[in-house]
Amino acid sequence: MKEQKWTHEGLITESLPNGMFRVRLDNEDLILGYVSGKIRRSFIRILPGDRVKIEVSRYDSTRGRIIYRLRNKDSKD
């Protein structure tokens, strides 16, 4: 039986060593996120300020896997 996971969107607030990031979810929870293998193999850069999709286990809601980096919404600079 496959483990059920929640998918959230959030904002990267801090970059930590070894592909780990501090992520503030849209519901204001602060969790630790790590980069999934596909993102790591594709050399996708994730920086503080990026919006991401993160998959959180129901058993440990303090850690999650970053599964997608969202595109910026046509920012007006």
Curated annotation (Swiss-Prot):
Record's keyword terms, sorted: Chloroplast, Initiation factor, Plastid, Protein biosynthesis, RNA-binding, rRNA-binding
RNA-binding as UniProt keyword: yes
Main location: plastid
Boundaries of every S1-like domain copy: 1-71
A GO molecular-function descriptor: rRNA binding
Gene: infA
Protein name: Translation initiation factor IF-1, chloroplastic
Record's keyword annotation contains Protein biosynthesis: yes
A Pfam family that the UniProt record links to this protein: eIF-1a
Superkingdom in the source lineage: Eukaryota
Subunit annotation: Component of the 30S ribosomal translation pre-initiation complex which assembles on the 30S ribosome in the order IF-2 and IF-3, IF-1 and N-formylmethionyl-tRNA(fMet); mRNA recruitment can occur at any time during PIC assembly.
Gene Ontology CC: one annotated term: cytosol
Localization per record: Plastid, Chloroplast
Record's function text: One of the essential components for the initiation of protein synthesis. Stabilizes the binding of IF-2 and IF-3 on the 30S subunit to which N-formylmethionyl-tRNA(fMet) subsequently binds. Helps modulate mRNA selection, yielding the 30S pre-initiation complex (PIC). Upon addition of the 50S ribosomal subunit IF-1, IF-2 and IF-3 are released leaving the mature 70S translation initiation complex.
Gene3D superfamilies: Nucleic acid-binding proteins
Protein family: Belongs to the IF-1 family.
InterPro entries listed in its UniProt record: NA-bd_OB-fold, RNA-binding_domain_S1_IF1, S1_domain, TIF_IF1
